[in-house]
Swiss-Prot record:
UniProt cross-references to SUPFAM superfamilies, sorted A to Z: Scorpion toxin-like
Signal peptide: none
Sorted UniProt keywords: Antibiotic, Antimicrobial, Cell wall, Disulfide bond, Fungicide, Plant defense, Secreted
Name of this protein: Defensin D2
InterPro entries named in the record: Defensin_plant, Scorpion_toxin-like, Scorpion_toxin-like_sf
Family recorded in the similarity comment: Belongs to the DEFL family. Group IV subfamily.
Paired cysteines (S-S): C8-C52, C19-C39, C25-C46, C29-C48
Function in brief: Antimicrobial peptide. Active against Fusarium spp., Gram-positive and Gram-negative bacterial pathogens.
Main location: secreted
Gene3D superfamilies reported in the protein's UniProt record: Knottin, scorpion toxin-like
One BP term from GO: killing of cells of another organism
Organism: Spinacia oleracea (Spinach)
Domain of life the protein comes from: Eukaryota
Length: 52
């Protein structure tokens, strides 16, 4: 991982639809000001990560 500390995850506000590619989600999260993002869970939601 990028961070050695714990990561807090927040659903992306700008990402629409089913998250199939981590790179697309990561781009949306960076646009929102987060350092990273990836697809998570059964429902494939775009989750943005930041150090807690």
């Amino acid at each position: 991982g990028i961070f050695s500390s714990r990561k807090c995850k927040t659903p992306s506000k700008t990402f629409k639809g089913i998250c199939t590619r981590d790179s697309n989600c990561d781009t949306s999260c960076r646009y929102e000001g987060y350092p990273a993002g990836d697809c998570k869970g059964i429902r494939r939601r775009c989750m943005c990560s930041k150090p807690c």
